[in-house]
Amino acid sequence: MKVGFIGLGKMGAGICSNIVKNGIDVVVYDINPANVQKFVDMGASSAATVKELAAQVEVCITCVPMPKDAKGVLLGPDGVFENLPEGGVHFDLSTLDIETVVMLEAEAAKRGKKY
């Protein structure tokens, strides 16, 4: 199984680090190239875009700081929901309000994805 991880800040880095250390095949993406390089050095592969990452994984984990950031990586033609393969699962570990969570779950469901 290949896992995608988007958001390698303080929280995301700690979580993703444990996944990589346990030998899981991980593809990473972050807006900060230095954060990505740290995980490439640990054995993860990287994606140049969210779309590229989502298209090649079965499980996608996001861990971003704000609702606007979550919407930015999940929605739209280049987002996770449009590009995660059929049957793909998304786990959101982001800091979100309940209204955003409910909206994102509905958007995922429209596309046959699990949120």
Regions found by a protein language model. Name each.
Residues M1-T62, G88:
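NAD(P)+-binding Rossmann beta1-loop-alpha1 motif at the extreme N-terminus of oxidoreductases
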Residues S17, K21, L75, A106:
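Short, well-ordered alpha-helices that flank and scaffold nucleotide-derived cofactor binding pockets
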Residues T62-D78, S94-V102:
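Beta-loop-alpha module in the N-terminal Rossmann-like domain of NAD(P)-dependent dehydrogenases
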